[in-house]
Design a protein with these regions (language model features):
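Generic detector of contiguous secondary-structure segments
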Residues: 1-17, 119-120, 187, 196, ...
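N-terminal entry segment of metal-dependent catalytic domains or homologous docking segments
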Residues: 1-69
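Leucine-rich repeat
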Residues: 149, 170-174, 192-196, 217-223, ...
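N-terminal capping/linker segments that flank leucine-rich repeat
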Residues: 67-70, 75-175, 189, 194, ...
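Canonical leucine-rich repeat
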Residues: 165-168, 187-190, 209-212, 217, ...
Length: 826
């Protein structure tokens, strides 16, 4: 940056300096510009100004240039004297130079002003928004300048529980903005973000797309990608004017009419999944459409009209129609341009129509009723095929599909897999839950990087593999799942040096010595076995994730050198001594529940821990945790704590990152000290001995609160917890629930087995999807008729008549209502 100053040059009548150019400040002035003579009297000084640029040399000080430092003129030489009136051109030059210098001075001042303005600190109007921005940009408490904001092109503010985003107007350079999973209905602040190309506004409970919303969206001339999923929208008529959109996501809404979309002819990708759409005639003009997701819309029957329309979409390459209760797909045989087709989770048994789709690269038929796959042999271009969970026993038709790279066959009745031996391009293969005993055919699949032989799930008979020597040839294998496979000898794997992930859980093994050679492992799952000794793990220094849960381990000293571990599950063992863990400073997640632990001092050095589960032990002193400032989740439930001391609270308050705390099952009666843990978002106090919950009124950031199984009768303190999403108050002594009428964000509420008779306070809780009122004294359920979002409602063991229950069922057709009624129909 240059700072401009001025130096005054005066006529003194002295002899010029012996050089052709005269230096003023740090600028050289040519002889003909500096040769200013005396006027007619030879005395009057006429200064003019020359801009000097700071930072260009040692002399760039911007000081006035005096006659002592700069001399111009030629004293006594009358022949060179001039009068301004006699030399107008020379005078004009002088004036022009002076004007230029003045302009440079003004520009310099403006640059300084603009520089200061551009560095102005940004002041936010909404604290929640500022906090969310700082978290997204990882700025903590640093000064945030306007210049910083203008450099930001992508911003993720998802899940910050925001409602006011007016401050977003300053982020004028944004091209990508994610405001999903908030409570934002007003987006007027986006109007000037004309560089925005992608906007994710999903999961905001919008309900209605109004004219104001569309006006803002239309102003975003460059907007190409819009996500409005999970918003309970039913009417999308206003979207028809957003003609520049190329990608539109409308999944998980209540849409049935999509006629407004016919004008958005630039659309290339459209997601309509999980709605109630049967008529797709509006799509016929969307000739640029390449991807269409029409899954989970309960279509039932694919009729000729559907197929005629889909055929007209000449550029359509990807079609998703999963979970639609479809049984007949004969009409789909004409969609010969398709490259990817998903028909999973339907009721399809006959797939002969697919034989014409020879351009298919990807086909998903999982979760159907298919037994005959002969027609698939025609689909020579297939690279990905999913046939999981059907009724297939013969896979001979697959042997010619040599382009396959991914093949999923789990959950069928396959016993012979010789056809797979020809598929040498396979990289991913799943064969779990079949009737396979011989896997020798796999030895030729040397390109395999991922193999799944997991078993004993979903109640199926399962494989019976004893010999896995064929796997010894698969030297590129990186991931192997043997969970529940009844394979106890894995010595054949000793040469698989690329193996980084092994799941050997649920196998009833006790000896793991064969693991000593697999030193490349990064993820190892040995859960639900009969392991007591783990010395073989001592050399597994590359391990990052280790699951040893549900075994017979009491000595964990072999783990002390596994310093790369980030996730460790030792739950449900017989461990009491934790000293081997004290050097595992990379640990982020540690599960120690259901052991014999009393002393946790060894955990004091694990400063990277974010999640710690100590439940079902005998830990009463948590002072060792005081330095674990990254801890966000602590489960200290069922440890016979009894009393929450000031020391405990002091430790917990020091854990400034902690958001989730579980103190359930601890026989606690006094929770007054917990009122200071104002950062908590989730608190579980179920099954204690609590009667006074007044201290909880301060925890206004709570989203989840569990108080079931206590002695609570007064819940007035809960009226302040307006951010709650989930509340459990079952098995208490509650009669009055008026305090709940302010908790309009509640989605899940459990009040079973209390003494509640009047439920009128619930009438405004329109966000509820789960409500449990069983085991109370309720006789009138009229207050529930407006809760149109209810999906699960439990009313057992109340004083309801059959008529009242039936009337409620008519009012809430979408809800599954579990109830019984008294014999009196009055």
């Amino acid at each position: 940056m240059f700072k401009f100053t001025c130096a005054a040059l005066t006529k003194t009548g002295k002899k010029p300096v012996n050089r052709d150019n005269y230096m003023v400040g740090n600028l050289y002035v040519p002889q003909d510009h500096a040769d200013l003579r005396n006027n007619a009297q030879g005395k009057t000084e006429q200064p003019f100004f020359v801009a000097a640029a700071d930072g260009m040399g040692d002399e760039a000080s911007g000081e006035k240039v005096s006659a002592e430092t700069t001399e111009v003129g030629n004293k006594g030489n009358g022949s060179n004297d001039f009068n301004d009136n006699e030399n107008p051109k020379r005078y004009q030059k002088k004036v022009i130079i002076a004007v230029i210098c003045a302009l440079l001075l003004v520009i310099g001042i403006l640059v300084c002003i603009l520089s200061k303005t551009s560095k102005k600190q940004l002041n936010f109007h909404d604290a929640a928004f500022e906090k969310a921005v700082r978290e997204a940009l990882n700025l903590a408490d640093d000064e945030m300048l306007t210049t910083d904001i203008l450099r930001i092109k992508e911003l993720d503010l998802s899940g910050k529980k925001l409602s006011d985003i007016s401050d977003i107007a300053s982020f004028k350079k944004l091209t990508t903005l994610n405001i999903s999973s908030n409570e934002i209905s007003d987006i007027s602040a986006l109007e000037n973000l004309t560089n925005l190309t992608e906007l994710d506004w999903s999961s905001n409970k919008i309900g209605v797309i109004n004219d104001e919303h569309v006006s803002v969206l239309r102003s975003l001339k460059n907007l190409q990608v819009l996500n409005l999923g999970y918003n309970n929208i039913s009417d999308i008529s206003a979207l028809g004017s957003l003609k520049n959109l190329q990608v539109l996501n409308l999944d998980f809404n209540n849409i049935s009419d999509i006629s407004a979309l016919e004008n958005i002819t630039n659309l290339q990708t459209l997601n309509l999944s999980s709605n109630n759409i049967n008529d797709i005639s509006a799509l016929k003009k969307l000739t640029n459409l390449t991807e269409l997701d029409w899954s989970d819309n309960k279509i039932g029957v694919i009729n000729d009209e559907h197929v005629s329309l889909l055929r007209s979409l000449k550029n359509l390459q990807t079609l998703v129609m999963s979970s639609n209760e479809i049984s007949n797909i004969s009409a789909l045989g004409d969609l010969t341009n398709l490259r990817s087709l998903d028909l999973s989770e339907n009721s399809i048994s006959d797939i002969r129509a697919l034989g014409n789709l020879t351009n298919l690269r990807s086909l998903d038929l999982s979760g159907n009723k298919i037994s005959d796959i002969t027609t698939l042999k025609k689909l020579m271009s297939l690279q990905t095929l999913d046939l999981c969970y059907n009724n297939i026993s013969d896979i001979g038709a697959l042997k010619k599909l040599t382009n396959l790279q991914t093949l999923h066959l789990s959950g069928n009745s396959i016993s012979r897999i010789f056809a797979i031996g020809n598929l040498t391009n396979l990289q991913t293969l799943s064969l779990g839950n079949n009737n396979i005993s011989d896997i020798s055919a796999l030895k030729t699949l040397t390109n395999l990087t991922e193999l799944d032989l997991a078993d004993a799930m979903y109640g199926l008979t399962g494989n019976n593999i004893n010999d896995i020597s064929a796997l010894g040839n698969l030297t590129n294998l990186q991931t192997l799942n043997l969970s529940g496979s009844k394979i106890s000898d894995i010595s054949a794997l000793k040469n698989l040096t690329e193996l980084t992930k092994l799941d050997w859980g649920y196998n009833n093994i006790s000896d793991i010595s064969t693991l000593e050679n697999l030193t490349s492992l990064q993820t190892l799952e040995l859960n639900h076995n009969s392991i007591s000794g783990i010395r073989a793990l001592g050399n597994q220094t590359n391990l990052q994730t280790l699951d040893l849960s549900d075994n017979e381990i009491n000595n964990i000293s072999a783990l002390e050198n596994l310093t790369s571990l980030q996730t460790l599950d030792l739950s449900d063992n017989k461990i009491s001594d934790l000293r081997a863990l004290e050097n595992l400073t990379s640990l982020q997640t540690l599960d120690l529940n259901f052991n014999n632990i009393i002393d946790i001092n060894a955990l004091g050095n694990l400063t990277s821990l974010q999640t710690l589960d100590l439940s079902f032990n005998n830990v009463s002193d948590i002072s060792a945790l005081k330095n674990l400032t990254k801890l966000t989740k602590l489960n200290w439930g069922y440890n016979k704590v009894g009393i929450i001391t000031d020391r405990d609270v002091s430790v917990l308050r020091g854990l400034t990152s902690m958001q989730e705390l579980d103190l359930s099952g601890n026989n606690i009666s006094d929770i007054s000290a917990l009122g200071n843990l104002t950062n908590l978002r989730s608190l579980d106090l179920n099954y204690n001995n609590i009667s006074d919950i007044s201290a909880l009124g301060k925890l206004t950031n709570l989203r989840s609160l569990g108080l079931s199984g206590n002695n609570i009768s007064n819940i007035s303190a809960l009226g302040n917890l307006t951010n709650l999403w989930s509340l459990s108050l079952s098995e208490n002594s509650i009669i009055y629930i008026n305090a709940l009428n302010k908790l309009t964000d509640l989605q899940s509420l459990r009040l079973c087995f209390n003494n509640i008779g009047d439920i009128s306070a619930l009438t405004n809780l329109t966000n509820l999807w789960l409500l449990d009122l069983s085991g109370n004294d309720i006789s009138d359920v009229g207050a529930l008729e407006n809760l149109s979002g209810l999906l699960l409602l439990y009313l057992d063991n109340n004083n309801l008549t059959k008529q009242k229950v039936e009337e409620l069922c008519l009012k809430l057709p979408q809800a599954q209502i579990q109830s019984e009624w008294v014999d009196n129909d009055d």
